[in-house]
Structure formats: C-alpha cells, structure tokens
Amino acid sequence: MADKPDPSSPADGPEPLFSFGVIADIQYADLEDGYNFQRSRRRYYRHSLVHLQGAIEDWNKESSMPCCVLQLGDIIDGYNAQYKVSEKSLELVMNTFQMLKVPVHHTWGNHEFYNFSRDYLANSKLNSKFLEDQIPQHPETTPSENYYAYHFVPFPKFRFILLDSYDLSVLGIDQFSPKYEQCMKILREHNPNVELNSPQGLSEPQYVQFNGGFSQEQLNWLNEVLTFSDANQEKVVIVSHLPIYPEASDSVCLAWNYVDALSIIWSHQCVVCFLAGHTHDGGYSEDPFGVHHVNLEGVIETAPDSQAFGTVHVYPDKMLLKGRGRVPDRIMNYKRE
C-alpha cells in the first residue's frame, strides 16, 4: 500500500527501546464471505488467513524486529463449531503463526468460547501463560488458576498484563456449575430480553451474552500487580479482548463491569495504554488520567485489498503505533509525572 510511509522505519530519530506487533479478530473460517448479524458489514472469513500471512511477513522483515506479537482474541470464527471444524481451523491458523520469528501472546474472546470450552483452551496452544514473568518476592502478583491472566516484562521497566475479560461469562463453561449460575444471574439481572445477545432497551447495553467481565478475584490481582509497578516505576500496557472505555468503543462491546476495571487502573500511576479488540471498527481515546485506549480494527472485516494490523514502537516518552491498512497511525505520549 503506497499511501503510507515505510512502517519499518518508525521515525527519523532515535531507535525505539523495543517494538511489538498487534492484531485482532482474525476470525478465520473456511467459508465464503458473509455478513454480521445486522447484515450491515461484510466479513471475509477465508481471506483473514491471507491477511495474517501478510502481517507475519511484514513483522519478520521489519528493521526493528518486534519482541512479540499480541493477538487480541477471536482467532477463529464461531461458525467453525457449527461445521465441526474448530480444531482443524485452529490448527491451520496456529501453523500460520509458526512462520513468525517471535513469541505470540494470545487473549481469549467470545469466539474462542463458541468453539471450545475453557478447560480445552487452558490445555491448548492458545494458552500462552508459559511466557509469563513471575515476581518471586511478591507472591500476591501471581495470578490464580481460576482465570486466564498473566504479566510479562518485554523490556526493563515495562510490564504487560493480559486480562481475562470472560472470567465472568456464560460462554465456554459447564451449564451446571456454580460459576455459570452466578454469571447467568448477573446477566439476567441486567438484561431481561429473551434473546440475551440483544441490547434492545438496556440502560447498560454491555450486558449481553457475547460480552463478559472480570471477577473480583482477578481485579484484586490486577490491583496488586499495578501496586508493584507503581512502586518500581514501571510503565504498564494492559491487553484484553473486551474494551473498557466508553469513549473508545461502541457501548454494546464493553466489558460488563468495565467501571470496576477503570477505577482500579485510575487509582494507579503506571498504566499508559489499554489494548483491545472485539469492536471490529476500531476506536481510540485518551482518558482523563492519560491512559491511551486503543481498540484495534478487526481483520475479519478487512477487504482483500487492505490490511489490519500494526507495530507499536516504544520510546522513553511515548509509543508510536504504525498501522497498516485500516489501522491508523497513533502517537501516544505518556502522561507527565
């Protein structure tokens, strides 16, 4: 695409400290093109794999090689379950990722749970928790096995935290379990509709079945990690499938209890960026506390002649997102101390 400068040369200035790749909502399926539920947006199920291959080729040849790639969830489409090809499609996408020369951190979205149970995912290649960094002197920063979340250090004084935004959810868990009952109760308290995927008439439209939320246990853990990062002057990037900031997202795509997550993040100094997928349209806003909320445009709704991924180049004073195709460039300055 000739309309953008060469993204592999981020700036005519100092070299970045490090870089990382971002991609969201690949939603691959071996199907002809289709449309979203409202039939207003086209989905390129088969071509999403070609887009992924193109992204990997670009990342592999960048002059400043990304240290890792963040895959923001919905790696294969829910249609795969209907046709009983979930494992086959996942294997195809994961084999494509093997061409990448750097590690991939995977978040889980609603389409993961349309295809697989939480137990299956925990034992699959989509569990990238083995890439975590631990802080032995601070056991309170070790996540519980009850949710899929972890943190890692890609570069000194920078910490990335992957959150489980379907920790509270009715998707992918045993319908006879206490957790399912608890989550269904939360959902029905906020959504009286017969069709639980419909936000019609809701004052809090995020309370639909295709979204989820964060348990208090996970939020307490997040608070502990951010407390450690504050004390150690770290800058933190948080990664989640679901967005949490209304100004950067369609309200129907937010995490159920996004307010709880925001209040914890806003009680700390260290968070500089919150990366999410899910919306497909993308979105961006800097909140009043200087946190940059970036919702990445989804691969699944990206035409064959475009692209949808990016590389974030990290500097001492800012992050530069160099987007490809539908993903715009963004300059994200850190808040002044």
UniProtKB/Swiss-Prot annotation:
This is Manganese-dependent ADP-ribose/CDP-alcohol diphosphatase. CDD domains: MPP_Nbla03831. InterPro entries: Calcineurin-like_PHP_ApaH, Metallo-depent_PP-like, MPP_ADPRM. GO terms for molecular function: 2',3'-cyclic-nucleotide 2'-phosphodiesterase activity; ADP-ribose diphosphatase activity; CDP-glycerol diphosphatase activity; manganese ion binding. It catalyses: CDP-choline + H2O = phosphocholine + CMP + 2 H(+); ADP-D-ribose + H2O = D-ribose 5-phosphate + AMP + 2 H(+); CDP-glycerol + H2O = sn-glycerol 3-phosphate + CMP + 2 H(+). PANTHER family: MANGANESE-DEPENDENT ADP-RIBOSE_CDP-ALCOHOL DIPHOSPHATASE (PTHR16509:SF1), PTHR16509. The keyword Nuclease does not apply. Its EC number is 3.6.1.13, 3.6.1.16, 3.6.1.53. Zn(2+) 1 binds at D25, Q27, D74, H280. Its cofactor is Mg(2+). It holds the Pfam family Metallophos. The modification N-acetylmethionine is found at M1. Monomer. Belongs to the ADPRibase-Mn family. The gene is Adprm. Hydrolyzes ADP-ribose, IDP-ribose, CDP-glycerol, CDP-choline and CDP-ethanolamine, but not other non-reducing ADP-sugars or CDP-glucose. May be involved in immune cell signaling as suggested by the second-messenger role of ADP-ribose, which activates TRPM2 as a mediator of oxidative/nitrosative stress.
